[in-house]
Amino acid sequence: MIKSKIVLLSALVSCALISGCKEENKTNVSIEFMHSSVEQERQAVISKLIARFEKENPGITVKQVPVEEDAYNTKVITLSRSGSLPEVIETSHDYAKVMDKEQLIDRKAVATVISNVGEGAFYDGVLRIVRTEDGSAWTGVPVSAWIGGIWYRKDVLAKAGLEEPKNWQQLLDVAQKLNDPANKKYGIALPTAESVLTEQSFSQFALSNQANVFNAEGKITLDTPEMMQALTYYRDLTANTMPGSNDIMEVKDAFMNGTAPMAIYSTYILPAVIKEGDPKNVGFVVPTEKNSAVYGMLTSLTITAGQKTEETEAAEKFVTFMEQADNIADWVMMSPGAALPVNKAVVTTATWKDNDVIKALGELPNQLIGELPNIQVFGAVGDKNFTRMGDVTGSGVVSSMVHNVTVGKADLSTTLQASQKKLDELIEQH
């Protein structure tokens, strides 16, 4: 019996030393990367990145899982319930909060990647947006961002003898002077529909006046003097916009067809501006009241919880690889101008410097990147990001509040009080 054990042990040792043993071939690990780039040209870019990674890491295979944006969140839920979540998932900072709340994120793995890349690799303020609610971890590794603000036609303002508006009062003055509803020309295109865009746009003004939906203790703070001032201002500003409920298409079309020389929109208006042929005629500004507040949405790559050790380690390697200068530049430049780099290394690459779109925009990309430290979002207070903000946005209470006082001409004080009550009840349920 002892002898047979020795023979078996010898065989195992021999097998371990011989490269031809079949067990050696089982070192390959396969991981999945879920993202929203369903367009063929974008998938081609990602395929090249994956091929580059696999060449550097011959034991790892990465499979793309492209999912339409509209079906994205549902797909995450479906896959999580069946225990088949991809190891790496592209996600907005908003949805990452939901994933973290459901304990779908491997916080330790995300922290490992951020440690590998270095916190200093990111622009100031970026990592703050992906902080967990308790401020102790991150929900993902940021790869790009878009921001929103006021876009304006330089020639129209110059012809009217008006300067770039720097604060609330100046913006209102410019909008009023350019407003000519009798001729179907309006001072500014603003979202007023019961939509996420309306909440995002209003949030810039509220946060600029130090009004937030939550306070540091996680209590709802909608019915405050600061929020009342912001809502009053937004209502006054909408007196100079197109009548009715305006959403994404109405705002964008009004700016692009000359109906309004100013508009609140994200950097995703830039492809249309470039196509128009004179991008340097368009300026960008974030009007400030008590402080500067720009709405921004970060895209991150997150690593999911519950995977095998070797899969998690492979995912860490892949996301770390994606943050290397040339790789992250290729990712960001799938949407040049519209998607902003959050990793400082991007602007040092030839991919960025030699891009025709970036060249055509002149100093604007640098100006937009310079706004990243000013990103503020509802539900983020200090180093805390309240996950319940997702429930607030999902409820539509804030956008309905704005819609009701602008389009519906409802009483401000009554509307604020009613909205506060609705959110108090909502938070008590969760």
Curated annotation (Swiss-Prot):
Keywords: Periplasm, Signal, Transport. It is found in: Periplasm. It comes from the Bacteria. GO terms for cellular component: ATP-binding cassette (ABC) transporter complex, substrate-binding subunit-containing; membrane; outer membrane-bounded periplasmic space; plasma membrane. It holds the Pfam family SBP_bac_1. GO terms for biological process: transmembrane transport. Belongs to the bacterial solute-binding protein 1 family. Probably part of the binding-protein-dependent transport system YcjNOP. This is Putative ABC transporter periplasmic-binding protein YcjN. It comes from Escherichia coli (strain K12).
